[in-house]
């Protein structure tokens, strides 16, 4: 089961995602990211975008995934409210393939909150918890 939350971090907002699988944790932290930007509960699945990124390790993979989503928000004007991803390790690197579901940003509908300027490695953690679930977190640049 995917879950996400924001957490206090000095003057910034931390985002954290949980899942029964690594993929669910990545999906959940992406939801947390977009809930910093808008009210994700108001986003409809009107567009489906294919996502494919890779990284040398899980941290760089998470960075690349969220950076791609933020790019699509900034350049294409899209907001996302759901994700389905698969992660595999191949030839010494991690590959994430999946889909992001959302729609064009509408300030009247989506209730804008904060502007996320960039994804960072600040306070980034990806770990398996004692209960077997996965957690992914970081502090984006607001």
Curated annotation (Swiss-Prot):
Detail which positions bind Ca(2+): 12, 141-142
A GO molecular function term, named singly, is:
calcium ion binding
Any single biological process term in GO: tRNA splicing, via endonucleolytic cleavage and ligation
Q: Which UniProt keywords apply?
A: Calcium, Metal-binding, tRNA processing
The record, for SUPFAM superfamilies, names: MTH1598-like (SSF69819)
InterPro entries named in the record = Archease (IPR002804), Archease_arc (IPR022952), Archease_dom (IPR023572), Archease_dom_sf (IPR036820)
Question: What does the sequence similarity comment in the record state about its family?
Answer: Belongs to the archease family.
Q: Which NCBIfam families match?
A: PRK00407.1 (NF001617)
Its biological purpose is as follows:
Activates the tRNA-splicing ligase complex by facilitating the enzymatic turnover of catalytic subunit RtcB. Acts by promoting the guanylylation of RtcB, a key intermediate step in tRNA ligation. Can also alter the NTP specificity of RtcB such that ATP, dGTP or ITP is used efficiently.
Write the protein's name: Protein archease
**Organism in which the protein naturally occurs:** Pyrococcus furiosus (strain ATCC 43587 / DSM 3638 / JCM 8422 / Vc1)
């Amino acid at each position: 089961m995917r879950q996400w939350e924001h957490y206090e971090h000095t003057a910034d907002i931390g985002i954290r995602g949980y899942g029964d699988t690594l993929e669910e944790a990545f999906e959940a932290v992406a939801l947390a990211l977009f809930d910093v930007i808008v009210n994700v509960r108001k986003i409809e699945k009107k567009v489906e975008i294919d996502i494919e990124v890779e990284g040398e390790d899980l941290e760089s993979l998470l960075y690349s995934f969220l950076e791609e989503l933020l790019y699509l928000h900034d350049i294409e004007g899209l907001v996302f409210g759901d994700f389905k991803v698969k992660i595999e390790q191949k030839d010494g690197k991690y590959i994430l393939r999946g889909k992001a579901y959302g729609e064009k940003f509408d300030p009247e509908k989506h209730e804008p909150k904060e502007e996320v300027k960039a994804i960072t490695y600040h306070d980034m953690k990806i770990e398996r918890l004692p209960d077997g679930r996965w957690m992914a977190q970081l502090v984006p640049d607001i």
